[in-house]
């Protein structure tokens, strides 16, 4: 009998506990469900059902804060209520920091921000929000330190990080030191190129070199950019770094077309079309393994400039461009010419027409005072004659350029 009574008592207690647990689970579940609502009434209901639901209390505080419903004291109390349930809730500390700075309590805002800072670890979203608050408080160092982590963790935010850094900090050295990690350096270099901040690129490139250097794609993009800005000396140094085993002292790179052109930097740019084909001839050549062959289809009166290379020169100096060329059955009087040009300047050879065996030619020119680079290449100008559909083949090999003598200044 006693055992039975004991059993019944234990069963009753367990039943009561189970009912209580179920009720608590239901209450907690309903509160949690309401806590995800953007409706203030449902959020208030969630807090009434379960005051321990820190998420619900925070969301209610945040909603009142953003919509400016109720006074700051009530919103502040809600933030603190959420923290009483979870003191490590970084979003509540950030909310307090923003509330305080909005109401002019900068010291309290900074204290709350520091509390949040110690709890965020490496969350990009929270660090981003913290950065914005730090900027408002004038703590640029903290803001940039946070943005450094954001840029490293979230590639999609890197451009915004760099934009904000330049908008707020303005000092390139500070931005590079505090907001740009080694991992982000290539992306930052690309950003500086896109936004045309030439002076700021040099320390970035130097730091890249100290950390193993950039890949060839980034190096080529930077070399192209520097050439476009007129800094051919640095661009040539970068080019030499891409091809450390090659002789980069020659003014014309890959003059024998022994390597497939990359189409960037100081290498050849070779384009093809339906009417003009470009390939390499391993049998017809003057030196090395192959020559460049151009073949015109005879279907079009082309205006063509499909082979070119940028060459660094000293403005005001004299140069001689030499090459070997041959032709076969090139029709029309407007044949193929070799040309050198830059802004407002052009020198060109006599056109190649008909058929001719290999022959050496030379073109001398003086680099204009405003041209740190010239472009050398092949050209076929569109013809205005009735017989204008060009066909035939042209070969080019052993292209070289040498400096002859500097221009002498004229007497006054």
Language model features: what each stretch is:
Residues 4-28, 32-34, 156, 160, ...:
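Extracellular and organelle-lumenal recognition/adhesion modules and their flexible linkers in secreted
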Residues 33-44, 66-81, 102-115, 138-145, ...:
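Structural signature of tandem alpha-helical TPR/SEL1-like repeats
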Residues 45-46, 81-82, 115-116, 150, ...:
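Canonical positions in the second alpha-helix
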Residues 49, 85, 119-120, 153-154, ...:
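Structural marker of alpha-solenoid helical repeat scaffolds
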Residues 58-59, 91-95, 124-130, 145, ...:
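Alpha-solenoid helical repeat scaffolds
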């Amino acid at each position: 009998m006693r055992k039975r009574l004991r059993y019944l008592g234990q069963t009753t207690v367990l039943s009561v506990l189970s009912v209580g647990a179920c009720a608590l689970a239901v209450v907690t579940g309903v509160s949690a469900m309401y806590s995800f609502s953007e409706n203030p009434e449902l959020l208030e209901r969630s807090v009434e059902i379960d005051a321990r639901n820190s998420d619900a209390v925070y969301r209610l505080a945040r909603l009142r804060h953003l919509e400016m419903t109720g006074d700051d004291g009530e919103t502040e109390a809600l933030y603190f209520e959420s923290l009483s349930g979870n003191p490590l809730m970084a979003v509540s500390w950030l909310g307090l920091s923003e509330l305080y700075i909005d109401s002019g309590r900068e010291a309290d805002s900074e204290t709350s921000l520091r509390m949040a800072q110690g709890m965020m670890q490496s969350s990009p979203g929270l660090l981003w929000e913290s950065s914005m608050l730090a900027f408002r408080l004038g703590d640029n160092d903290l803001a940039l330190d946070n943005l450094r982590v954001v840029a490293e963790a979230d590639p999609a935010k890197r451009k915004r990080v760099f934009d904000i850094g330049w908008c707020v900090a303005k000092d390139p050295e500070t931005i590079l030191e505090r907001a740009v990690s080694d991992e982000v350096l290539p992306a930052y270099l690309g950003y500086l190129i896109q936004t045309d901040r030439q002076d700021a690129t040099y320390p970035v490139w130097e730091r890249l070199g100290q950390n193993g250097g950039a890949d060839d794609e980034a190096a080529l993009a930077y070399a192209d950019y520097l050439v476009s800005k007129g800094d051919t000396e640095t661009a040539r140094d970068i080019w030499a770094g891409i091809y450390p085993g090659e002789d980069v002292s020659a003014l014309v790179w890959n003059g024998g077309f022994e390597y497939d052109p990359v189409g960037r930097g100081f290498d050849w740019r070779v384009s093809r079309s339906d009417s003009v084909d470009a390939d390499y001839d391993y049998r017809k050549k003057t030196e090395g393994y192959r020559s460049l062959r151009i073949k015109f289809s005879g279907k079009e009166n082309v205006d063509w400039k499909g082979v070119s290379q940028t060459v660094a020169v000293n403005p005001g100096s004299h140069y001689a461009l030499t090459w070997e060329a041959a032709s076969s059955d090139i029709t029309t009087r407007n044949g193929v010419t070799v040309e050198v040009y830059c802004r407002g300047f052009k020198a060109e050879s006599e056109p190649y027409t008909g058929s001719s065996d290999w022959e050496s030619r030379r073109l001398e020119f003086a680099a204009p005072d405003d041209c740190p680079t010239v472009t050398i290449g092949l050209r076929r100008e569109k013809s205005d004659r009735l017989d204008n559909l060009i066909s035939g083949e042209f070969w080019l090999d052993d292209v070289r350029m040498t400096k002859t003598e500097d221009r002498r200044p004229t007497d006054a």
